A protein has these predicted regions:
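Conserved Rossmann-fold NAD(P)-dependent oxidoreductase catalytic core, especially the SDR/UDP-sugar
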Residues: 25-67
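Glycine-rich NAD(P)-binding loop of the Rossmann-fold in SDR/ketoreductase-type enzymes
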Residues: 15-26, 62, 66, 70-73, ...
């Protein structure tokens, strides 16, 4: 089973908890009762919180700033402590791809962020590849994996990819919640992951 459902944009803290944490718990219990062999949970790199520009490793402490990543981290904790279910966690970065308006939709929220702030990203194709690799692995060496492409572009570059001027940096404090670069070496070393779109420019 691959569990990707989540409530993110516009969710209150209560809604994020109800859907992303409690909803995941209910689904996991149902999966165990149905003898599901493997349960893959897509989480978020935002669980690490502000990293100060240093890529976060899977074993680093997590300090989520907003309700959404906090609810995802709570769900991770429940799943990883659960007995009788083979759980694998894939922490995703900012996901983009053909026909996906994610970048355009995020522009208003990030308009006040620093233009030089970098963001870990992954193309849809690479997310699908990573999900398949992790789901098919008979016995992965770890239970939690980060997923990132080879290059974390600046927000100015991300904005330019959809023809928008760079963000103005007027709300740098709010941007801290999204300043979460990730280290992607583990999934490459353990599972042989290699992105088909290693850089944003490769997908444009």
């Amino acid at each position: 089973m691959v569990h990707c459902a989540a409530f993110f944009r516009g969710a209150t803290a209560e809604q994020a908890h109800a859907v992303n944490d409690l909803g995941t718990q209910h689904l996991a219990r149902a999966a165990r009762a149905a003898s599901v062999s493997r349960f893959l949970f897509t989480s978020t790199g935002l669980v690490y919180g502000h990293t100060g520009g240093r890529p976060a490793h899977e074993d680093d402490p997590c300090a989520p700033i907003d309700a959404y990543p906090a609810s995802k981290l709570a769900a991770e904790g429940f799943l990883l402590a659960m007995e009788g279910l083979d759980v694998r966690v894939l922490r995703l970065p900012f996901v983009y791809g053909d026909g996906d308006p994610h970048i355009e939709e995020a522009i208003p929220m990030m308009r006040g962020f620093p233009p030089a702030q970098r963001m870990s990203i992954a193309h849809h194709v690479d997310v699908a590849q990573a999900v398949a690799l992790l789901l098919d692995a008979p016995s992965p060496a770890h239970r939690v994996y980060n997923l990132v492409d080879d290059e974390a572009p600046s927000l100015a570059t991300l904005f330019a990819s959809v023809g928008e001027p760079p963000p103005d940096g007027s709300n740098a404090e709010r941007a801290r919640a999204f300043d979460a670069l990730m280290d992607g070496r583990r999934i490459r070393e353990d599972l042989g992951f290699k992105p088909k779109f290693p850089r944003l420019a490769d997908a444009l």
